[in-house]
């Protein structure tokens, strides 16, 4: 299984915010983009998805930015993946036209939906706090 880049960026952004203690103060998206070596438009798009998902809140203005909406321990990795990944995993029908009306109801696609849900359920017990490595040498590499 491969996560979309946006989901990977989202997990990195949330981990960055958790590691910097950004529950109290907003962090500008440009600062996050620079720290994570992500383009600002990608960071902005991902931040918008995280806002829509209720994982971060935004503050406008000169000292604005984004901050965690909840404690890192309360943000499930499974919930983040469910929120940002496409809602359905679909495989094309074999031997049929690409836009087959039955595609979403085929046995293969029902199995893929079940697999995606089990994948997310496996991630549910883990939180963003579990991704934060507080060792100084790791933090130094992350910020380089």
Model-based region annotation:
Residues 3-38, 57, 67:
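N-terminal helix-turn-helix DNA-binding core of bacterial DNA-binding proteins
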Residues 34, 51-52:
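Alpha-helical residues within the helix-turn-helix
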Residues 41:
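Key DNA-contact positions within bacterial/archaeal DNA-binding proteins
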Residues 47-48:
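Short, hydrophobic-biased segments on the C-terminal half of alpha helices
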Residues 53-69:
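Beta-hairpin "wing" of winged helix-turn-helix
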Residues 65-85, 89, 96:
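Charged, amphipathic alpha-helical coiled-coil/dimerization segments
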Residues 76-77, 96-144:
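C-terminal regulatory/oligomerization modules of transcriptional regulators
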């Amino acid at each position: 299984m491969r996560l979309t880049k946006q989901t990977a960026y989202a997990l990195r952004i949330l981990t960055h915010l958790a590691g910097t203690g950004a529950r109290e103060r907003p962090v500008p998206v440009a600062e996050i983009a620079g720290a994570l070596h992500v383009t600002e438009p990608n960071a902005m798009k991902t931040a918008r998805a995280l806002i829509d998902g209720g994982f971060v809140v935004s503050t406008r203005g000169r000292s604005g930015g984004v901050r965690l909406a909840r404690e890192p321990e309360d943000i499930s990795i499974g919930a983040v993946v469910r929120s940002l990944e496409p809602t359905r995993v679909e495989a094309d029908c074999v031997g049929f036209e690409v836009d087959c009306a039955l595609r979403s109801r085929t046995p293969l696609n029902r199995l893929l939906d079940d697999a995606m849900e089990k994948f997310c359920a496996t991630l549910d017990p883990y939180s963003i706090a579990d991704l934060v490595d507080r060792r100084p040498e790791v933090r130094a590499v992350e910020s380089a």
